[in-house]
Amino acid sequence: MRPYAAHPPAAVRDGGGERAPEAGAMTSTGAAGGTARPQQELDDLLDRAAIARLIDRYTLLLDSQDEPGTAPDWPRSIFTHDCRLVFPIGEHHGLAGLGAFHDAAKQKFSATHHLSSNHAIVLDGDRADIRFQMIATHVHRPDTRRRAARDPGPLFQVGGYYAGRAARTADGWRFASWSFHVVWTSGTGPADLD
């Protein structure tokens, strides 16, 4: 096995011996078969990367929002001021009370673990349609298990997807409309314990 080369041979860099495009040359085609501007492609990549980071921040905050050091106004770094959320547990509009809305759901469990994947981002100027898969594991609180008529077991899991729209703001990309769609569950959820 060859060690990793910091500078691959020219044949690898330029596609196996084909001539590498000149700097500034238009090299890719858009969906309609026309040529795309390299700067637009770069801007699109940067926007997609920023939105992917937004998704990652949100996914991490779902699990860490109640940990010491997390700013109580964390939703401002994720959502627009007029955001609209539609979840199986309820709906919320605007930033006011949004942290408490998320926290109330999380406090039903002693811990949560969210995993996201397959981030589909479709740019439309200063807006973007987003969809990604989510698997969330929720660890029931010991007192919840003791109080239940029938022990729900240690875990409640949910698989589904988030879908919504993001908007470019003065502070960067933020979710403007956001919803979660359940595809499957495993275990007993809080609604079945109340």
Predicted regions and their residues:
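A beta-strand edge to alpha-helix "cap/lid" segment located at domain peripheries
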Residues: 2-13, 17, 22-39, 107-118, ...
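General secondary-structure edge motif
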Residues: 31, 38, 54-55, 78, ...
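Alpha-helical interaction segments
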Residues: 47-49, 91, 152, 163
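Short, aromatic-enriched amphipathic alpha-helices that serve as compact interaction elements
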Residues: 47-67
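Glycine-rich, flexible loop segments associated with nucleotide phosphate handling
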Residues: 62-65, 69-79, 149-159
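A solvent-exposed, acidic/Ser-Thr-rich amphipathic alpha-helical stretch
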Residues: 64, 71-136
